[in-house]
Each structure stands twice: as structure tokens, then as C-alpha cells.
UniProtKB/Swiss-Prot annotation:
Pfam families: F-box, Kelch_FKB95. Kelch repeats lie at residues 122-168, 170-195, 196-241, 243-276. Keywords: Kelch repeat, Repeat. The lineage of its organism: Eukaryota, Viridiplantae, Streptophyta, Embryophyta, Tracheophyta. It comes from the Eukaryota. Residues 8-54 form the F-box domain. The keyword Transcription does not apply. This is Putative F-box/kelch-repeat protein At1g19930.
Length: 344
């Protein structure tokens, strides 16, 4: 029996409110592909009403935003988001099916030496360095419209601050005092067990917002987090340090353990730029590979890792896929500075 196909003209003649309701139920990973269907689809996919509908019907998703920064003086940021890749009939290369799609975001504020934190569908850009001076500014990226808004300034200027979200509030530490390196005093914040853990130097402290108490963590938690990458997934801290394995922190015995099961991943170069992020309970891992004559360019790679706790002393990672996700090489001057998971 022959199936009846819906005429293309019928789809394109749908009123905007109905089209918004339909597209709101499609995974946001597919939006870049849908934007290629027609100018009208591309226009509807930018409407705030679309994202309001997604929120109302409970269909928001974790979306990974990636920011590449140039070492040039102007520090122009380039923004991307992870999405599904259009598969062409002529494609012969085995692919994960994912790619970093460019996001045109005009009038981006400086992001050099600042801290980014996601709050709902927004990304807060806090502090940093503007014209080689510490900044107290706060700017907000609306990930529905991809426009920047000016937020309330901090009372203190901060360079290399660390920001975390806890109970609906953003806590910012560090970055106030200039050291002899010309950088702010540096800490790294993570939220575990409902407490803000702040590590800097050789010791750390934990802040409990319920009773306002600060408790010492000692030195066992600190591994120089500021110079690598860390994230918290389902109340467990994960951490990467140059040329080492990915580790997780066992709060019961207060020690770091190696994340098992990642033998299919390559060994990262000593000075590779590695970033970790919580991607809906899985680990998103980004790193770069040097290419070209004299390692003049970089390729940006990504792996999505499912995590499984097998007993109290072991966590295993299963690499679901890994692939080069930027379709082209980038000059050595560009680094993957930030990876942020946003609910949109």
C-alpha cells in the first residue's frame, strides 16, 4: 500500500504559532540542520517564543557551548555549539555524526581571564581583564536569542576569578590580588554535597550556605585545579591535569582515584588544552591535536563518556563516541578556552 506523503507546500504554509509548537518538540541538536531547509525555518528557529514553548512543555535540553579565544590583543571570541552533523550521500568518512556549529554572536564582551557559569538558559561572564586591568563587569549571554546583556557590576575587580552556582546564587572567589606573575590570586570552585568547595594554594575551604560555616579541607583535595580542568557530575568531582589521567575525588577517604575504562582515548599532548563539562550526567571531554608543519594548527576533538560507579572505590567511563568536531583546523593562536552546558 502506497503511503501518502505530506505535501511540502503544506508544511511551509503552516502558521508561525503551529510551526513553533512543532519545532519545539524537535531536539535542539538538529536545529542547525533544520535552519538549512528554508529561510522561514531559519527565522522561526531564532524566535524567543520557540524557546519559551520548549521550557513550558518541559523539553529543554543540555546544550554544549564552546568558546575559542585568540591570543591576539583584541581577544575576539568565537562561539560554537555541539549539534548533529548533516550527513551527505557523498560522505565516505566514518563519523560520530556531531559537529561544532558556528554561532554568530555580535558585540561579545572581552572574555580574557574571566569566569563563565551557566544559570538556566543564560551564561554569565564574570570579571576578567579589560585593557590589561582587572574588571568588575558582569555580562550575560541569553542563549535563546544569542545576545549579550549587561549585568550588575561586582563591588570588587577580579582577574582569573572562579564562579559557581549554588542554591540559585552565584558565588565568586579569587582574582582580587595581583601576584608577582601579574595574575590575580587564583582559586577554583566546585559545588559538592550542597557546599561550595574553594581550593587555592595548597589548602581549601568548604562553605555551607545553610549555616554560614567555613570548614578547612586540608591539602589533600588540591592538585593545582586552576591550571587544568574540572567539573562536577552527579555530585562527584572530576579533574584533569597536564599529562595525567582523568581523576575523581573520593570524599569518603579524601583521596583522588583514576577514572577507569578510557583506554580507547588517545594520550593527550603534554600541553594540550583539555576541558571537561557535565553533559546531562555524562562527561563531555574536549581537547586539541596539533597538526600541520611545525604544529602550526589545531584540530578540536570531543568525546562523550557515560559514567558508571561499580563499587565504592571504582568509577568506569564508557566512551560513547570521539571525533574531530570542528570541520576545519584553527591557527595555533586559538585555544578552546571555555565549555559550558546550558539548558535551552
Amino acid at each position: 500500500m502506497k503511503k501518502n506523503k505530506v505535501p511540502t507546500e503544506l508544511i511551509f504554509s503552516l502558521p508561525n504559532d503551529l510551526l513553533v509548537n512543532i519545532l519545539a518538540r524537535v531536539s535542539r541538536l538538529d536545529y542547525p540542520i533544520l535552519s538549512l531547509v528554508s529561510k522561514r525555518f531559519s527565522s522561526v528557529l531564532t524566535l524567543p517564543e520557540l524557546y519559551q514553548t520548549r521550557s513550558l512543555v518541559g523539553l529543554t535540553e543540555n546544550c554544549l557551548y564552546v568558546c575559542l579565544l585568540s591570543s591576539r590583543a583584541d581577544r575576539i571570541p568565537s562561539w560554537f555549539k555541539l549539534c548533529r552533523r548533516p550527513i551527505l550521500a557523498s560522505d565516505t568518512r566514518k563519523s560520530s555524526g556531531y559537529v561544532l556549529a558556528t554561532i554568530p554572536i555580535p558585540h561579545s564582551p572581552p572574555l580574557h581571564r574571566s569566569s563563565l557559569v551557566a544559570v538556566g538558559s543564560n551564561i554569565y561572564n564574570i570579571g576578567g581583564s579589560i585593557s590589561q586591568s582587572q574588571s568588575s563587569s558582569v555580562s550575560i549571554l541569553d542563549c535563546w536569542s544569542h545576545t549579550w546583556l549587561e549585568g550588575p557590576s561586582m563591588q570588587v575587580e577580579r582577574e582569573y576569578p572562579s564562579a559557581s552556582l549554588l542554591d540559585g546564587k552565584i558565588y565568586v572567589t579569587g582574582g582580587c590580588r595581583l601576584t608577582f606573575h601579574g595574575c590575580g590570586d587564583q582559586t577554583d570552585n566546585v559545588v559538592v554535597d550542597g557546599k561550595l568547595h574553594s581550593c587555592g594554594g595548597y589548602k581549601g575551604v568548604a562553605y555551607n550556605p545553610n549555616d554560614g560555616r567555613w570548614d578547612s579541607l586540608g591539602s589533600e583535595m588540591n592538585l593545582g585545579l586552576k591550571w587544568s580542568s574540572s567539573c562536577v557530575i552527579e555530585n562527584v568531582i572530576y579533574y584533569y591535569y597536564h599529562n595525567e589521567n582523568i581523576k575523581w575525588y573520593d570524599t569518603k577517604v579524601r583521596s583522588w582515584r583514576t577514572l577507569n575504562g578510557l583506554k580507547t582515548l588517545p594520550r593527550f599532548a603534554r600541553y594540550a588544552n583539555v576541558r571537561l563539562a557535565d553533559y546531562g550526567g555524562k562527561m563531555a571531554l574536549f581537547w586539541d591535536k596539533f597538526t600541520g608543519c611545525g604544529n602550526q594548527n589545531r584540530m578540536i576533538w570531543c568525546a562523550i563518556i557515560a559514567l558508571e560507579r561499580r563499587n565504592n572505590e571504582e568509577i568506569w567511563g564508557n566512551v560513547e563516541w570521539s571525533d574531530a568536531v570542528l570541520p576545519h583546523q584553527v591557527p595555533m593562536a586559538y585555544v578552546c578556552e571555555y565549555v559550558v552546558a546550558v539548558n535551552v
